[in-house]
């Protein structure tokens, strides 16, 4: 009996020691990954204790670059495009300029970054996109990138509705047209047409980013502004476009450090509810 008890005690001690070792390893992995990702993005050293608020910088750098960046299967380019559209949506322009440079450092092309920001326009409005592009263009110029960039438009005045509808209908059907039919003065039909022509015909048809990427970025923008009805519709559209629930979830988690927990949790609960139906 004593031998059995001693054996059990040793097993418990061994498991406890392994657990403590794993915790230390996870902590070290978090720090090492933070430093690696930060260097790739910004070319500097993370966790250096410098500046006026080194404590909060230490917390945010470990959290973002050491934990969020290893949650879900997103490549670093996609993560940085998501960060940029979040910052553009919130009009955090100094941070956007810094992250535009970081995006270039990890392989996002100027066209991809510009298209990511343009994709926000139907959701957040043109003034905010123009503000965002001001600092993004500054980042371009500082890198010796000539602006304006090459056009990525693929539609004409004659076919923008048709081409937009070709993308919109398989993903969303005619729900908006039906929902707006009773708007006073018959103007709901015009608004539904604007949506097809502008959101899908003018933007979604553009080259530079594919439809799954555009839908993923759009979901992130909607997450930032907390547009609950649209989050439901665009989650379904993301799935139809080929983005898995896990990928959309990882994208929302990538937004979390920049937008806070409440807005991200709202979007995560919508993903959960939609995928459980």
Where are the regions a protein language model picked out?
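Bacterial Sec-dependent N-terminal signal peptides
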Residues: 1-22
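Acidic, glycine/proline-rich low-complexity segments that act as flexible tails and inter-domain linkers
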Residues: 20-76, 129-211, 240, 257, ...
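Electropositive phosphate-/nucleotide-binding environments in soluble metabolic enzymes
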Residues: 28, 32, 54, 93, ...
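Ordered, small/hydrophobic-rich secondary-structure cores
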Residues: 47-114
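Extended intrinsically disordered, low-complexity coil regions enriched in Ser, Thr, Gly, Ala
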Residues: 75, 91-114, 118, 128-141, ...
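Alpha-helical transition-metal enzyme core signature, strongest for iron centers
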Residues: 89-93, 123-126, 224, 255-261
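Short, glycine/charged-rich beta-strand-loop motifs at protein surfaces that mediate ligand recognition
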Residues: 206-207, 220-225
């Amino acid at each position: 009996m004593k031998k059995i008890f001693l054996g059990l005690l040793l097993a418990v001690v061994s498991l406890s020691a392994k657990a403590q070792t794993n915790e230390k390893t996870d902590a070290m992995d978090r720090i090492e990954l933070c430093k690696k990702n930060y260097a790739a993005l910004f070319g500097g050293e993370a966790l250096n204790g410098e500046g006026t608020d080194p404590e909060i910088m230490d917390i945010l750098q470990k959290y973002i670059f050491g934990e969020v960046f290893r949650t879900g299967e997103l490549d670093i380019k996609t993560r940085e495009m998501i960060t940029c559209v979040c910052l553009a949506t919130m009009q955090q322009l100094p941070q956007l300029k810094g992250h535009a440079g970081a995006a270039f450092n990890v392989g996002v092309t100027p066209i991809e970054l510009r298209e990511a920001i343009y994709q926000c326009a139907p959701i957040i409005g043109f003034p905010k996109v123009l503000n965002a592009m001001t600092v993004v263009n500054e980042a371009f110029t500082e890198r010796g990138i000539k602006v304006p960039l090459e056009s990525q438009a693929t539609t004409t005045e004659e076919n923008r509705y048709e081409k937009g509808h070709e993308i919109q209908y398989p993903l969303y059907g005619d729900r908006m047209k039906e929902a707006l039919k009773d708007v006073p003065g018959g103007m709901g039909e015009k608004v539904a047409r604007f949506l097809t022509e502008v959101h899908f015909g003018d933007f979604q048809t553009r080259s530079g980013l594919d439809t799954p990427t555009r839908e993923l970025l759009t979901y992130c923008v909607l997450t930032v502004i907390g547009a609950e009805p649209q989050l439901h519709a665009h989650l379904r559209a993301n799935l139809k476009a080929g983005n898995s629930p896990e990928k959309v979830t990882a994208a929302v988690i990538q937004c979390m450090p920049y937008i806070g927990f409440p807005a991200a949790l709202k979007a995560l609960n919508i993903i959960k509810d939609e995928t459980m139906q």
